């Protein structure tokens, strides 16, 4: 694993962060957002797909790490809509021969800060420190994408090896026996 593409999926704004870890240290290559201008779902999905494909073609990552789908039971429609964003990202990755691994928000927070309930500010401080940034990463979608990419890197460094059979597109199966997982 040398280049990790972290993605925070969203229908209107999808954050991404590309890091190079080939030297054993983390180096930020690029971070940004793919903004959907379309008012229609099919247009939004197409714009996300095109934007992520462009990032993949530019940086040629070895893997895509994405935030795991989560929604409150009061808002099932949110999960369905977010599933569309995740689906087109998984398709873009698959068509480039890349595996996608997902991490829940609690797992990302715990790996980055040691606290699964860390605040956004604590996460941003951890990212700023690790990437040697002069300011906090903004907007929040970018910060989340960088946190996910860093989480995947630290996950591997902590000795948790991911078998190819556990890399299912959009499904978190890294800790199948971990009962603390969200």
Report residues per predicted region.
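Phosphate- and other anionic-substrate recognition elements at nucleic-acid/protein interfaces
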Residues: 1-182
């Amino acid at each position: 694993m040398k280049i990790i593409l972290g993605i925070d999926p969203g229908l209107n704004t999808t954050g991404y962060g590309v890091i190079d870890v080939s030297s054993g240290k983390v180096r930020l290559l690029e971070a940004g957002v793919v903004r959907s201008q379309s008012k229609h779902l099919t247009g939004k999905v197409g714009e996300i797909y095109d934007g992520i494909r462009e990032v993949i073609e530019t940086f040629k990552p070895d893997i895509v790490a994405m935030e795991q789908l989560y929604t409150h039971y009061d808002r099932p429609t949110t999960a369905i809509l977010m599933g569309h964003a995740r689906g087109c990202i998984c398709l873009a990755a698959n068509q480039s021969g890349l595996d996608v691994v997902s991490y829940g928000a609690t797992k990302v927070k715990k790996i980055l800060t040691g606290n699964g309930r860390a605040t956004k500010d604590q996460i941003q401080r951890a990212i700023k420190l690790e990437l040697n940034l002069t300011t906090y990463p903004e907007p929040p979608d970018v910060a989340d994408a960088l946190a996910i990419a860093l989480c995947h890197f630290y996950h591997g460094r902590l000795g948790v090896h991911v078998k190819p059979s556990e890399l299912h597109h959009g499904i978190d199966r890294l800790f199948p026996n971990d009962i603390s997982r969200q």
